Swiss-Prot record:
Principal location class: cytoplasm
Post-translational note: Phosphorylated by GSK3B, which is required for recognition by the SCF(FBXW7) complex and subsequent degradation. Ubiquitinated by the SCF(FBXW7) complex following phosphorylation by GSK3B, leading to its degradation by the proteasome.
Gene it is expressed from: SETD3
Subunit structure: Interacts with MYOD1.
Annotated protein name in UniProt: Actin-histidine N-methyltransferase
Organism phylogeny: Eukaryota, Metazoa, Chordata, Craniata, Vertebrata
Region (Disordered): 1-22, 549-595
Domain remarks: The SET domain specifically recognizes and binds actin, suggesting that it does not accommodate substrates diverging from actin.
Amino acid sequence: MGKKSRVKTQKSGTGATATVSPKEILNLTSELLQKCSSPAPGPGKEWEEYVQIRTLVEKIRKKQKGLSVTFDGKREDYFPDLMKWASENGASVEGFEMVNFKEEGFGLRATRDIKAEELFLWVPRKLLMTVESAKNSVLGPLYSQDRILQAMGNIALAFHLLCERASPNSFWQPYIQTLPSEYDTPLYFEEEEVRYLQSTQAVHDVFSQYKNTARQYAYFYKVIQTHPHANKLPLKDSFTYEDYRWAVSSVMTRQNQIPTEDGSRVTLALIPLWDMCNHTNGLITTGYNLEDDRCECVALQDFRAGEQIYIFYGTRSNAEFVIHSGFFFDNNSHDRVKIKLGVSKSDRLYAMKAEVLARAGIPTSSVFALHFTEPPISAQLLAFLRVFCMTEEELKEHLLGDNAIDRIFTLGNSEFPVSWDNEVKLWTFLEDRASLLLKTYKTTIEEDKSVLKNQDLSVRAKMAIKLRLGEKEILEKAVKSAAVNREYYRQQMEEKAPLPKYEESNLGLLESSMGDSRLPLVLRNLEEEAGVQDALSIREAISKATATENGLVNGENSIPNGTRSEDENLNQEESKRAVEDAKGSSSDRADAVKE
């Protein structure tokens, strides 16, 4: 049986500092909020801003050292209590056990043979920590008054977790005591570990995540110290950055969507037991049974007794896994890198290209993706590139010519080129673009592989270098693939080969051999990460919770086929009101949080 323990707040002991007055921290957090609320830095200035923000955060952390909430013992000491609590409240606890798998960390191990598609795990709603349970908790009064909490479910869930952790008699203590004491998300990276990500695509999201989390903490520190509805929160006397970083990471690595009790909408939830499962390639096998009001998971494959039980977290890139889940997944069949493309408004054919793209349902500017698997581009990216490289005559054919509608619908089908010349142009463009992106990195693929052989690297440093290496390998594969395609279509053009007759096809825009089953992935703005989060506006901030940002440790969500996070679906007007409300209250509490 796990060691019984009451939650405690460390106020003395090794490394603990003298008690710091709230006023002193208020001054520091005000400075931090001001710094984090400044306009986005110009090109090449992101690292400088990151270091400045980090310096302030570290100053706060140093003054708060020893004041964070902790538990006695190790998390595994409390596993028996978790299993007992889960069993007493209707969850399944037979057929598996929690085990430390070393490199993968803790996970579930089968204690009997489990067949593929067999229901082996279910967790009833009463055990879940949700936005709804947050509203009905001690956090409720503040939630009802704070627009940021209302607009950003992930932050509400993080505060719910903090409040329950600080309450020894909380119903969820058996679960909370088994959560990791720290994570490997970039919020926990040392400055030198983040430095390994410089010049990568992922580093922009890392900077944004860190800045947004610091801004949130600074804003809510003042709220907790000054808002009348925060007086009864157990965080009143101790709300440290360390605590908030832990809560944000716990939520971003574990949150999932489930239906509300009436099934009319979705809400965010933490799901005990189930969130112990580690990831592998496959399909989402978790759903929510509204009739029995419980989360259910069937086996992804046959698992023999003694084997680790895996689930599929969703079609996420390694950048998403590292930033939002804190791990790198080798051989990720869904890995990809972003590529921002757009038709220039100075292009004399802009209007015609924009019209063709609009008819195909594709924006004139978007974040697409280059994939790890073949083919490296999706049907929508193929369609965009075809339009991007069209001549005036080809554009007219797609707008006014015979069978113009059919031409639009086959834009994304690799079997029906617009023209051989168009294919040569688009693959040449893609080859050049990917080559240019490769040149922006400060190290080569060979250099990264050499560095990884250094056994002195920390786990997080290795993860960062693997991510850097993975980006370059995807780009290199795209260059090679584009070159092969370019030469193939050049040969077709030289031989004056007849073009396939598109009229014979009933295939739609996205039903292409060049496409893949992930569509329309490339037009999702790559989820809550919203592109690379350049020049985040206040509205973008509130409608997209950085703490959430795709941070699903156990799957895209708990509903099959993976809808996205609550924040992605926020009504824009509600988000706008949330910001305005936060702004209006700045004179009383703090400036608005701008994520």
